[in-house]
Amino acid sequence: MSPAKTVGTLIMGIVNATPDSFSDGGRYLDAERAVAHALELVAHGAGVIDVGGESTRPGAERVPVEEETRRVLPVVTALAERGVVVSIDTMNAETAVAAVEAGARIVNDVSGGLADPGMLAAVAATSADFVLGHWRGPSSDMYARAAYADVARDVTVELSERLREAARAGMDPSRVVLDPGIGFGKTAEQNWAMLASLEHLVALGPRVLVGTSRKRFLTAALSDASAADSAPASAEEPSVARRDAATAVTSVLAERAGAWGVRVHDVAATRDALAISAAWRAGASWTA
C-alpha cells in the first residue's frame, strides 16, 4: 500500500522506542515489544507506523545519532519485512537515510529539515515521502518562540517557504506532507487557533498530517472541563483514556477540515471515531 493512495483519512500509529517520551517513554524501548505493539496498531487500523528513537517532548535533550539508530533500525527492519508501511520519526538525515535503506517509506521530521541542514537533500535523493513539520526551534526552549501575529497565517506562510526549500533541494512537492506542528512552539490557545483554521493549510495543496495525540493542550482543556465537577477525582490529571478520547475528537475535526492523516497513540479509538463520522456524513443519503 502506498501512503499516497490511502482511501479516507490515514491513521498513523505511534511507536516510541525511547526511554523518555512524554506519554509512553520506556514501554517500547525493547525492539520485540515495539514490533509487537506496532503490529497490534496495524490490526486496529493503522495504515502507517511512525517509529521514533528520540523524544521531542518539551525540554527533551537531543540523542546521539548512533543511539537513535540503535533504537529504531531493528524495529523498522522487522516491520518492513512484514509489509508494514513504516515512517521514521527523526530530525537527523543520517538516521533518515539508514531507516529508508532498512525499509521505511516515509521520513517524518518535526523540524521540517531545519534541525539538520542536510535533511532535505538527503531525503530528496531517496524515494521516501517527507512529513515537513512546522518548527521554530528545539524542544528545550520551544515556547520562547511562540510569538505570532496570526498563528494560522504565520504557520501557513512558514510551511510554504519550507515547501519551496524542499523543492529547491530536489524533492517533488507530491512527496511532501505538511504538519502544522501542534504542540511545538505554540501555546494552548495557539494550538486551538491553528486547528480551527486548518482548512487554510489544507488549501495549499499538499497532504496535511495532524498530530494532537495526548498533548498538553488537550490535558489543559480536559482539566478545565473537570473544574466544575465536585468529585475529588476532578483535581487529578486527566487519564490516558480521556486524553485518547479527546484525541479521537480532534482527529475527526481534522478529517472534516481536509487532513490527509492523523498521528495517534490509540489507533482503535480514532478508527472508531472516524467510522462514526463517516456514517454521520453518509446519513444524508440514506432513505427512511
Question: Which functions belong to the PLM regions below?
Answer:
Residues P3-T6, S23-H37, T56-A78, V85, ...:
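Active-site-adjacent loop and "lid" segments of alpha/beta metabolic enzymes
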Residues G8-G13, E40-G53:
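N-terminal glycine-rich anion-binding loops that anchor highly charged ligand groups
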Residues G13-I14, T212:
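Pocket-edge structural micro-motifs
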Residues N16-D20:
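Short polar catalytic/cofactor-binding loops
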